[in-house]
Regions:
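Rhodanese-like catalytic fold shared by cysteine-dependent sulfurtransferases
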Residues: 2-23, 30-78, 87-123
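Short, surface-exposed ligand- or partner-binding patches at beta-edge/loop junctions that are enriched
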Residues: 81-82
Length: 123
C-alpha cells in the first residue's frame, strides 16, 4: 500500500509557500517548461528542482533516481511532485517511495490542469 498523498495544486502551493525545508520537483520535459511555462520558484520558500522523468520521445530517464539522489535530499523530507496532469509525478513519487523516501506528495491536477488555471504563480 502506497503512502503517497495526492494534493491539489492550490493546497501544494499554500503548503510550500513558507516551507523552506520542502521540495517541489517538476518532472516535465524541457519542451513542456518552455511551451506551457514553469512554476514561479521565487514565489515560495521550498526548494525547486526540474528533473525530467520521461523525455519527449516517451523514454524513461533511467538515471532519474541517481540524479535525484545527487541533490542530497533527506529521505524524510517533504517532497512534492508535479507534471502536466498528475500521472508522471505519481510515477516519480512511487520510484522514490520504493527507495525509502517517506513524505511524498503528488500534485494530482498537475501544472496545466491545476497550477496554471488556478492562477498560481508561474512564468
Amino acid at each position: 500500500m502506497s503512502n503517497i498523498k495526492n494534493i491539489s495544486a492550490e493546497n501544494c502551493y499554500s503548503t510550500i509557500k513558507e516551507n523552506k525545508d520542502a521540495y517541489l520537483v517538476d518532472v516535465r520535459t524541457p519542451y513542456e517548461w518552455e511551451t506551457f511555462g514553469r512554476v514561479d520558484k521565487d514565489s515560495f520558500d521550498a526548494q525547486y528542482i526540474e528533473l525530467t522523468l520521461i523525455d519527449e520521445e516517451g523514454d524513461e530517464n533511467t538515471n532519474f533516481l541517481d540524479q535525484f539522489n545527487s541533490y542530497g535530499i533527506l529521505k524524510n523530507s517533504e517532497i512534492y511532485f508535479i507534471c502536466k496532469s498528475g500521472a508522471r509525478s505519481m510515477h516519480a513519487a512511487l520510484i522514490l517511495e520504493s527507495n525509502g523516501y517517506q513524505n511524498l506528495y503528488n500534485v494530482e491536477d498537475g501544472f496545466v490542469i491545476g497550477w496554471k488555471p488556478s492562477g498560481l504563480p508561474s512564468k
